[in-house]
Amino acid sequence: MKRKVLALVIPALLAAGAAHAAEIYNKDGNKLDLYGKVDGLHYFSDDSSKDGDQTYMRVGFKGETQINDQLTGYGQWEYNVQANTTEGEGANSWTRLAFAGLKFGDYGSFDYGRNYGVLYDVEGWTDMLPEFGGDSYTYADNYMTGRANGVATYRNTDFFGLVDGLNFALQYQGKNESQSADDVNIGTNNRNNGDDIRYDNGDGFGISTTYDIGMGFSAGAAYTTSDRTNEQVNAGGTIAGGDKADAWTAGLKYDANNIYLATMYSETRNMTPYGKTDKGYDGGVANKTQNFEVTAQYQFDFGLRPAVSFLMSKGKDLTYNNVNGDDKDLVKYADVGATYYFNKNFSTYVDYKINLLDDDDPFYKDAGISTDDIVALGMVYQF
């Protein structure tokens, strides 16, 4: 009986992160769910900046209120707290999600706040590894590739109720700028990122669509285009030029019969950051990247879920040592991992990231890109 329950519950948990939330209020059309997890996590690596304790806690809520038969208000908030620093170091925490919106029956939903960019509608299919993954080209606060500030999102499920499985989304992102290099307050000045202009963005627009073909197969695609800030366009050096930052992606997945397979391909232009730009490193923004991810997983009825994956991002026409037109792998690794679910609330996992970047290439040391392997061990309590 336990095996049958796990076989049903675990895929549902993986498909929707907060689907197993604890309902704390449900009355008179008002509903509030609380969800979260504590991950006791440790990395083993020759890279001293990665090696060691990585424990964190994540908590959030999802709420909705029934306004009338066709109109529902909703909101979500999610917060991350790192637990691998001393109490004297101060807060090491941040808001992951915070948005509110309205759902108009079959006519879709509209929300605004900090939310996932539409490119992640496809990227999320391969971002299913026990610990690593989802990092060939998607980063938080990098345009609409991951979690992002100031996004207004319209979503429609089943194409106005007319086509089962056909979903689409439209998204607009407002400008987000850090303080300029000469400490002059310009633009929005709402990025507290150490003046790293790589994570700024101008106004942008995105669209995504996914289709549940049936028999476990789904296909999806997304596209975004954004203005770049004046600081980004004029930075020079290893920072790509160009007035626009563009990205597109397409993906496929199969999720049935305890088997999960997913793959995606994407390209970006004037968008993707690599390496570090502080402490004398020569990281930058790639003029173009070509990105690929694939994962294969199997869910055993007794709770074990092994996974094998491969991810890569190739930077094109990079500027390195004052030479233009260099091509380099920015991300390239194989990943072997496994998760064991004791029940719907507790699991343990191991994840081995096998770094395939060439540690003899001076580019990676100069840019501050790690070429070391990482083994992650974790225990998770979730609710």
Swiss-Prot record:
One of its GO terms (molecular function) is porin activity. SUPFAM superfamilies: Porins. The keyword Transport applies. Keywords: Cell outer membrane, Ion transport, Membrane, Porin, Signal, Transmembrane, Transmembrane beta strand, Transport. It is found in: Cell outer membrane. InterPro entries: Gram-neg_bact_OMP, Gram_neg_porin_domain, Porin_dom_sf, Porin_gammaproteobac, Porin_Gram-ve. It comes from the Bacteria. CDD domains: gram_neg_porins. The keyword Nucleus does not apply. Coiled coil: none annotated. It holds the Pfam family Porin_1. GO terms for cellular component: cell outer membrane; pore complex. Residues 1-21 form the signal peptide. It is a multi-pass membrane protein. One of its GO terms (biological process) is monoatomic ion transmembrane transport. NCBIfam families: PRK10554.1. Homotrimer. Belongs to the Gram-negative porin family. Forms pores that allow passive diffusion of small molecules across the outer membrane. This is Outer membrane protein S2. It comes from Salmonella typhi. The lineage of its organism: Bacteria, Pseudomonadati, Pseudomonadota, Gammaproteobacteria, Enterobacterales. The gene is ompS2.
